[in-house]
Amino acid sequence: MNFSIEQYSKFMTLLDMLLHNLQTLHMSLEDSIKWLGEVMAEIGPNHSQKSEDFHVFEVKEANAIIDYLKISLFQHYRLYEFLFYSTREEIVIGTEQTIEVVKPADYPFPAPLEEGISLDTYSTFIEPLPTPDMEQKVLDQEQGTQEALLESEMREEDPLGGFTIDDVKSALERVTDEVLISMQKEISEKLQVQEEAFNARIEKLKKA
């Protein structure tokens, strides 16, 4: 059906009234069909003042509307009743999000990237002048850094830096002598043990 704008408006009004009867007045399916029949019965050339709002439809158009309501609202009437009357649990689904806020463009933090400018311009016009406390803090940090560097350099010095060549030679000779004496003593003990073993064997052979 090709309805006019006014007919579409009246049709939507009729549909809204049917849903209102269902949701608010709790009309049953039989009552809704009866109410629709009473409204549509007044459509025609001899319409009464009661259905003045719907006299824009002809009988053929009214029959088309009834056929549409049969296969839509009335066919699924129980579903609409369940939709309007049944209580349902409300499931609230939420997510927690952590939003990191950009730190303020205050010393020593730089401005956000989209607001970035050249270092020369920042140093000349924007960078705040250091306060005495800040200067003292910077000096303390520099002094601490220098002391740490000196300590690390002292630790990395050559461990033999305080000895002369003669001292190193004498130390090596002393260590070598101690090692050689220990080896000679060990060899002498082993030879003595072997000599005693040979002498014992010779004595056994003589007695035999």
From Swiss-Prot:
GO terms for molecular function: calcium ion binding. GO terms for biological process: sperm flagellum assembly. InterPro entries: CLAMP. It is found in: Cytoplasm; Cytoplasm, Cytoskeleton, Microtubule organizing center, Centrosome; Cell projection, Cilium, Flagellum. Testis-specific. Expressed in spermatocytes and round spermatids (at protein level). GO terms for cellular component: centrosome; cytoplasm; sperm flagellum. Pfam families: CLAMP (PF14769). Keywords: Calcium, Cell projection, Cilium, Cytoplasm, Cytoskeleton, Flagellum, Metal-binding. Its main location: cytoplasm. Calcium-binding protein. May be involved in the control of sperm flagellar movement. This is Ciliary-associated calcium-binding coiled-coil protein 1. It comes from Mus musculus (Mouse).
